[in-house]
Curated annotation (Swiss-Prot):
This is Thymidine kinase. The active site is at E94 (proton acceptor). The lineage of its organism: Bacteria, Bacillati, Bacillota, Bacilli, Lactobacillales. It catalyses: thymidine + ATP = dTMP + ADP + H(+). Its main location: cytoplasm. Its EC number is 2.7.1.21.
Length: 199
């Protein structure tokens, strides 16, 4: 039975490497996948899944108005008509940027087509608010898994994302800010509030 998965973690927890690995494993077995990512993320070009260690590949960009259920239905029907067989899996990177309707469409893909949907993304933003996509995945996903990484400052488990601009922590501003001069670091709770304190 297919399931809707949400794998979340702080910045630099290996989410993108993991999704690329899963895609490779399916394709190495001759299975067809749909690799998708947020159309908002243009750091490496729209429709590109790119890891920090330099591995990247093209993906289907998800727009705000896109109906994922209808898109996958059409893709699946086209593949069946061409004799390629149905999709084995839908993989979505940067899932925090999904809208509620996208998450519900993912659940419908799982329930009606029996195709697993694996989503990867951040849980909370730099202000420690849930992203819309993450909040709805926490509600509707069948399986939720945390991907762990360590604090940029002390090496303890990181659970938060700290935005830094000109060497100073930023706690206010737009939730989504792609391509600016800011840097984001995975941090523990203590260093989220005290980034300049050595422990």
């Amino acid at each position: 039975m297919a399931q809707l998965f949400f794998r979340y973690g702080a910045m630099s927890s290996g989410k993108t490497i993991e999704i690329l690995k899963v895609a490779h494993n399916y394709e190495a077995q001759g299975r067809k996948i749909a690799l998708m990512t947020s159309g908002l993320d243009n750091r490496s070009g729209v429709g590109t899944v790119a890891s920090r260690i330099g591995i990247h590949r093209k993906a289907i960009p998800i727009t705000e108005e896109m109906d994922l259920f209808e898109y996958i239905k059409e893709m699946n029907n086209h593949d069946l008509a061409d004799g390629d067989g149905k999709l084995a899996c839908v993989l979505i990177d940067e899932a925090q940027f999904l809208k509620r309707h996208h998450v519900l469409e993912c659940a419908k893909i799982v329930d009606e087509f029996n195709i697993p949907v694996m989503t990867f993304g951040l849980k909370n933003d730099f202000q420690n608010h849930l992203f819309e996509g993450s909040e709805n995945l926490l509600i509707f996903a069948d399986k939720i898994e945390e991907m762990k990484t360590i604090c940029h400052y002390c090496g303890h488990k990181a659970t938060m994302n700290l935005r830094i601009n000109n060497g100073k922590p930023v706690y206010e501003g737009e939730q989504v800010q792609i391509g600016g001069d800011e840097s984001y670091y995975p941090v523990c709770r203590y260093h989220y509030f005290h980034p300049n304190v050595v422990r």
